[in-house]
Amino acid sequence: INVTAGGDGIKSTNDTDTTKGYTTITGGEITVKAGDDGIKAETALTIDGGTITVSESSEAFEGTNITINGGTLDVYGSDDAINAASTTSSDIFIKVTGGDLKVAVGSGDTDAFDANGDIYISGGTIDVTAQSAFDFDGTAELTGGTVTVNGEQITQITATGPGAGGHGGW
């Protein structure tokens, strides 16, 4: 699937029905160039496999809950690459259990991983290129996987950048 969009590339939203707004990707090849969000799910975005490239976007992945269990992902966001936020839920998180992720963002007040809640990384290989790698309002746990930020492997997640701990938005 190749998507070029002036707004969101792939979008699953429904503000009024909590049983909707889910996107699950289990395989295939997806390429997105978007003027706004690359792939957005109002409630939950789950990636279990596939090859996903988001070469242009404001935010490559956006949702209330973002879970990455596998796949080969190469994503770029001019604002935040992976953004978990919500105006209606307090259960907000980014969870990475597997996969091969290459995550990059533009310069300025931008974040590779931005959660208005929690960040959990327990597996996978993550290569981040960013001025600010992690921004979160809740807790952050790194219990497995390999995470490299600007060429340096890290063993714990700390909030970084000018908006650390209180950033992100819907």
Predicted regions and their residues:
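A composition-driven surface/loop motif
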Residues: I1-W170
